[in-house]
């Protein structure tokens, strides 16, 4: 049995998730691959697998229940957070993981190939790249935990949005000032997240364009 199976199972249950043993196994395979590749390629600053479990896996899982359905784009996915976690837990959802860092995308492509995952692709490009905007099309949900600035994330997401698209931004503190600047154009729902074993403030912001 994987040394972190019980911890992941308990953590996911604390988040109100009922993940199958198969999905838990996939999540742990992902973490094992991340730990292995991280030794050579520096994919994440977090090196301790136990800390990775909390700050990457459980943190990403904490938004799962609140995400709307539909095709998903994860902008600045890095090593795959939260996009790969979502894809592994929701095989019926089509996911695109986007990052400009070649090493991180190589890792994700290799993992996708090794596990023969059908619902997720990793793309190396800059979010503002015109060709990528044309090729990838539009998405129902756009996630990120990479952007320091909410305004920057919204601007990056715009070309990939339908009128009904939900922007799902993972944040620590609530960026009240930035939300004020967006309030004429976007409705915003703020959801407080309780990540097991993480003593930090975490929030999910769900933004949707206000229809004129």
From Swiss-Prot:
InterPro entries, A to Z: rRNA_ssu_MeTfrase_G, SAM-dependent_MTases_sf
Binding-site residues for S-adenosyl-L-methionine, renumbered to this chain: 76, 81, 127-128, 145
Residues passing through the membrane, by range: none
Example of a GO cellular component annotation carried by this entry: cytosol
Cell compartments where the protein resides: Cytoplasm
Documented EC number(s): 2.1.1.170
Keywords from the named record: Cytoplasm, Methyltransferase, rRNA processing, S-adenosyl-L-methionine, Transferase
Pfam families membership: GidB
GO molecular function terms attached to this record: rRNA (guanine-N7-)-methyltransferase activity
Catalytic function, reaction form: guanosine(527) in 16S rRNA + S-adenosyl-L-methionine = N(7)-methylguanosine(527) in 16S rRNA + S-adenosyl-L-homocysteine
The protein's role, per its UniProt record: Specifically methylates the N7 position of guanine in position 527 of 16S rRNA.
Family: Belongs to the methyltransferase superfamily. RNA methyltransferase RsmG family.
The protein, known as: Ribosomal RNA small subunit methyltransferase G
Originating species: Acinetobacter baylyi (strain ATCC 33305 / BD413 / ADP1)
């Amino acid at each position: 049995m994987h040394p972190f199976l019980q911890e992941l199972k308990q953590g996911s249950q604390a988040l109100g998730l009922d993940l199958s043993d198969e999905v838990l196994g996939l999540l742990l395979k992902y973490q094992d691959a991340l730990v292995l590749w991280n030794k050579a390629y520096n994919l994440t600053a977090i090196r301790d697998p136990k800390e990775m479990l909390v700050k990457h896996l459980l943190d990403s899982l904490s938004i799962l229940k609140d995400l709307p359905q539909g095709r998903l784009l994860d902008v600045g996915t890095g090593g795959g957070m939260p996009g790969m976690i979502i894809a592994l837990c929701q095989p019926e959802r089509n996911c695109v993981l986007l990052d400009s860092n070649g090493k991180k995308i190589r890792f994700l492509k290799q993992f996708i190939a090794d596990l023969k995952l059908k619902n997720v692709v990793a793309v190396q490009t800059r979010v503002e790249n015109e060709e990528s905007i044309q090729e990838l099309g539009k998405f129902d949900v756009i996630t990120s935990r990479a952007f320091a600035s909410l305004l920057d994330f919204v601007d990056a997401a715009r070309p990939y949005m339908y009128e009904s698209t939900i922007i799902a931004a993972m944040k620590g503190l609530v960026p009240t000032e930035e939300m004020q600047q967006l309030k004429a154009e976007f409705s915003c729902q703020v959801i407080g997240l309780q990540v097991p074993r993480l003593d930090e403030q975490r929030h999910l912001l769900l933004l949707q364009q206000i229809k004129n």
